[in-house]
A protein has these predicted regions:
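Type IV pilin-like appendage domain
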Residues: 89-188
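Short, glycine/small-hydrophobic-rich surface segments
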Residues: 48-49, 71-98
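A broad, structure-centric signal for solvent-exposed, well-ordered loop/edge residues
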Residues: 8, 63, 78, 101, ...
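Homeobox/homeodomain signature
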Residues: 29-31, 40-46, 54, 61, ...
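Generic detection of short hydrophobic beta-strand segments and adjacent strand-loop junctions
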Residues: 64, 115, 150-152, 228-236
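Short linear sequence signals and composition-biased patches located at protein termini or domain-edge surfaces
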Residues: 2-5, 55, 159-253
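Aliphatic-rich helix starts adjacent to a transmembrane/signal segment
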Residues: 2-76, 245-253
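Short, ordered beta-strand-loop transition motifs
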Residues: 83-89, 118-121, 200-205
Length: 253
C-alpha cells in the first residue's frame, strides 16, 4: 500500500479521537483560553489604573497651578499684605491683580479671590470678586457670593500624613531670629504660624502660603496608586530677607 493510499484511509476513518486524546485537547484549550483571559484582565486593569492616575494628576495640577498663579500675582506693591483676615485652613482669601504695570495703585485691575475647600463635596472653588473702587492699599470689592465662582478641582480630599490630615492651606510668617549655623532645624526664616489670620493685623504678617491636597480621578476611587498627593509652598516676597540678628521682614518685601 502506497503512502497516498494510507493517508486516504486515515482521512476516511470515522473512528475519531480517543477519549484520552479528547480530554487532552479540551484541557489544553482551557489552559490557553484562561491564559488569554488573564492577560486581557491584567491589561484592562493596568489601562484603567493609568487612566485614573492621569486624570487625577491633570485635574490636581490644574487646580494647584491656578492657586499658585494667584498667590504669585498677589504682591501688588512693596509691603502690601495680600492675605486677608478671613482666611482659614480651608479657605484662602487674597487680593491680587494682573497688569503690565510694575506696581498697581488703583483698584481698577485688582480683584479678591476666595478659594474654598468643601469637604462634603470634595471640591475646590474659586470665587473672583471684582474691584468696585478704592485706592491702594485699601480696595473695595463685590460682596461674597456676588462674584464669579468656578470649580477648579473635583474629588479633592485632605492629604493624610499617618493618622493626621494636613490642612489645605497653611500660613507662614518670618521668625524674629534666624536659625543658627549649627542648628538641626530648617535654615528658612519662615515659620508656620499656629493660628490663621483671624485679625486684620495678623494677616499683614503672612509671608508664605503652603498648599496641600490629594486629587482623585473622576471615578472617585482613592485607592493606593490612583490618587495623587500635591504639596507646594508659595512665598510672598520680592527678595530674600537679610540675615540680620533680628529678622524684621514681612510680606511682599
Amino acid at each position: 500500500m502506497t503512502l497516498g493510499q494510507t493517508l486516504r484511509l486515515r482521512l476516511q476513518d470515522e473512528s475519531g479521537l480517543s477519549l484520552v486524546e479528547l480530554l487532552i485537547a479540551i484541557v489544553t484549550s482551557l489552559v490557553v483560553v484562561a491564559a488569554l483571559m488573564g492577560l486581557l484582565v491584567v491589561s484592562q486593569h493596568q489601562t484603567v489604573l493609568l487612566r485614573d492616575v492621569g486624570q487625577a494628576t491633570q485635574s490636581g495640577r490644574t487646580a494647584m497651578t491656578r492657586i499658585v498663579d494667584e498667590v504669585h500675582s498677589a504682591c501688588l506693591a512693596k509691603e502690601f499684605a495680600p492675605v486677608q483676615k478671613e482666611s482659614t485652613a480651608s479657605k484662602l482669601v487674597l487680593v491680587n491683580a494682573y497688569s503690565n504695570e510694575a506696581e498697581i495703585k488703583s483698584g481698577e485691575r485688582t480683584r479678591e479671590d476666595i478659594i474654598t475647600f468643601n469637604k462634603a463635596k470634595g471640591t475646590l472653588t474659586d470665587e473672583t470678586l471684582t474691584s468696585t473702587g478704592g485706592e491702594y492699599p485699601e480696595f473695595a470689592f463685590q460682596a461674597p457670593g456676588k462674584g464669579t465662582r468656578t470649580v477648579i478641582g473635583s474629588n479633592i480630599t485632605e492629604t493624610k500624613q499617618g493618622e493626621l490630615k494636613l490642612p489645605i492651606f497653611r500660613y507662614y510668617e518670618y521668625a524674629e531670629t534666624p536659625e543658627p549655623d549649627n542648628s538641626t532645624e530648617a535654615s528658612s526664616t519662615l515659620k508656620e504660624t499656629t493660628k490663621v489670620p483671624a485679625e486684620k493685623g495678623e494677616g499683614k504678617t503672612i509671608a508664605g502660603v503652603g498648599i496641600a491636597f490629594t486629587a482623585a480621578p473622576a471615578s472617585g476611587l482613592e485607592t493606593v496608586g490612583r490618587s495623587v498627593n500635591l504639596n507646594t509652598f508659595a512665598t510672598l516676597a520680592f527678595s530674600a530677607p537679610f540675615s540680620e540678628p533680628k529678622v524684621e521682614d514681612g510680606p511682599c518685601r
